Amino acid sequence: MAGLLFQGVVTAACVFPFSSDPHRLRLKRWWSKAMLDILGIRLDADLAHAVPGSMVVANHVSWLDIFVVNAALPSAFVSKEEVRHWPVMGWLAGINDTIFLKRGSRGHARLINAEIAAVLAQGKHVAVFPEGTTTDGTHVLHFHAALLQPALLAGRPVVPAAISYWEPDGERSLAPRYDGDISLGDCLKNILARIKELEHEGYEF
């Protein structure tokens, strides 16, 4: 996993700035699928019906959701401003077309909505998590409707997506949850620990 992360950082720094949009999207999809494979996550999604310039609207369970969406339909993301300052991950988000939103600032929200609408009008997909936070995946919180406004401004379609994680036996998996007091490190430990348990039970990844 560390090797793939390093490869992703190098690719983002050395290849992305010189790549065409289609090539960047292919790289994002490949890298996201590779990350999911390493973590033993099989993607079951069909967003092929999404026309260019669609807004993907999804619930939010985990930091893995970004890889899930990008593996299915490479998109720009709308994220809270704080993410920009995270070590490594913030830098990666910044060069991966992430649009950062300052919470609580109506003036900034209007500017961001115009920016998102412009991206959609260019035929690029934009993904948003309108709950504004994560849950354990067993329920959906109130949506912040203002995040959907750019699709209306640009006259672009909205593609709803329900994200959930499941065990091989069909039970809902809580290992990827990134809510409450769970840190990024704890979440990753939970996922890796669950992989080891499943391997011990005879599952192959």
Feature map (PLM): residue ranges:
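A transmembrane-helix-recognition feature enriched in membrane-embedded lipid enzymes
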Residues: M1-D44, W91-N96
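Soluble extracytoplasmic domains of inner/organellar membrane proteins
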Residues: A109, I116-L148, L152
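Soluble, non-transmembrane catalytic domains of enzymes that act on hydrophobic metabolites at membranes
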Residues: R42-D46, I66, V78, R84, ...
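A cross-family acyltransferase "interaction/gating" segment
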Residues: V88-G90, T138-F205
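Generic beta-sheet signal
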Residues: G53-A58, K80, T98, L101, K124-F129, A161-S164
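Membrane-embedded segments
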Residues: W63-L120, K124
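Conserved H-X4-D acyltransferase segment
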Residues: K28-E81, A93, D136
